From Swiss-Prot:
This is Prokaryotic ubiquitin-like protein Pup. Protein modifier that is covalently attached to lysine residues of substrate proteins, thereby targeting them for proteasomal degradation. The tagging system is termed pupylation. It comes from Streptomyces avermitilis (strain ATCC 31267 / DSM 46492 / JCM 5070 / NBRC 14893 / NCIMB 12804 / NRRL 8165 / MA-4680). HAMAP family: Pup. Residues 31-42 have a biased composition (Basic and acidic residues). GO terms for biological process: modification-dependent protein catabolic process; proteasomal protein catabolic process; protein pupylation. It holds the Pfam family Pup. One of its GO terms (molecular function) is proteasome binding. The keyword Coiled coil applies.
Amino acid sequence: MATKDTGGGQQKATRNTEEVEEQAQDAQASEDLKERQEKLSDDVDSVLDEIDDVLEENAEDFVRSFVQKGGE
């Protein structure tokens, strides 16, 4: 009996191509997440710097706002 070629080699090549494409998509997603994390980190640092500036200028007022007066 003669065996029939089912084209299994093509399926393997297609599977490898799909794996490479999936890895490329994962790498892109990872890079996008890294960029987003860096941006958020920069935003948080900016807000913290602004808070520090306000506290340096108005530290006494800031502390007074938290001191209870007359049993409040």
